[in-house]
Amino acid sequence: MAAQVRVLRQRIRTAKSMKKITKAMELVATSRIAKAQDQVAASLPYARAITEVLTALASNARIDHPLLTPRERVRRAGVLLITSDRGLAGGYSTNAIKTAESLLARLRADGKEPALYVIGRKGVQFYRFRNRPIAASWTGFSEQPTFADAREVGQTLIKVFTAGVDDADGDPGPDGVFGVDELHIVSTEFKSLMTQRPVAKILGPMQVEDRPRAEGLLPAYEFEPEAEALLDALLPKYINTRIYAALVESAASESASRRRAMKSANDNAVEMIEKYTREMNSARQAGITQEISEIVGGANALAASGSEV
């Protein structure tokens, strides 16, 4: 009985240590959700403004720009996948990878060669373990992304997209770049603390929607400098802004998923502590009962031997 009590006491100590760790991780994840939500809210006005300006430029000027004009034939499509750098986040990265895999399968079915760009160690590990090619990868900022991180990713994607596909038989062509004709992004939308949804969206070319104009005077725009120069300056910022928005929303989703996973682990630790405590108390009770029985039995034996004398 004593050995069993020692084992159970050690299990209780282990469960309590695990509970401290999971509770701390839950609190950290909760604080990061709030920070990421603030980043999302702060980025929205800029994203709306730059989208409105670009829509006005594209609608009021007949301009052919690589980031605006769909290619006649899409030979290769780039896919940017956002996953986490660390584990213990439930199905966050797994669900994003599943969405990316579905997109890659659709692209192949349409006769398009996919080129994969991955953010986060979990995504990189998934594809490298399976010997799947990755065109470029970035790690180390999935939980707390900055606009500088988004700009670094955006520079690579803009370069390959503006280059287009002009290679053949493994030769990158005169520009030395294995370009793409289309850009997609797979990220995770933050709906609430309990709901996050992986989504796949078109990143390039920019999709300009023809919105109905209100009755009355039509708005007049004067571009200074010329519309072409403005597009050259603003379209890369638009791509970077889209990537940054996806990064911060995915960061909020990752933290929410990790918080949920850690809360579940914390609840399980509490249940384990209660279970092992009950078992330890039962074992101690059984040990005490056995000792009392042995004492009573010994006393009865002594009494019996004394009466015989």
From Swiss-Prot:
It holds the Pfam family ATP-synt. GO terms for molecular function: ATP binding; proton-transporting ATP synthase activity, rotational mechanism. Belongs to the ATPase gamma chain family. Produces ATP from ADP in the presence of a proton gradient across the membrane. The gamma chain is believed to be important in regulating ATPase activity and the flow of protons through the CF(0) complex. The keyword Flavoprotein does not apply. This is ATP synthase gamma chain. Signal peptide: none annotated. Transmembrane segments: none annotated. PROSITE patterns: ATPASE_GAMMA (PS00153). It comes from Salinispora arenicola (strain CNS-205). One of its GO terms (cellular component) is plasma membrane. It comes from the Bacteria. It is found in: Cell membrane. Keywords: ATP synthesis, Cell membrane, CF(1), Hydrogen ion transport, Ion transport, Membrane, Transport.
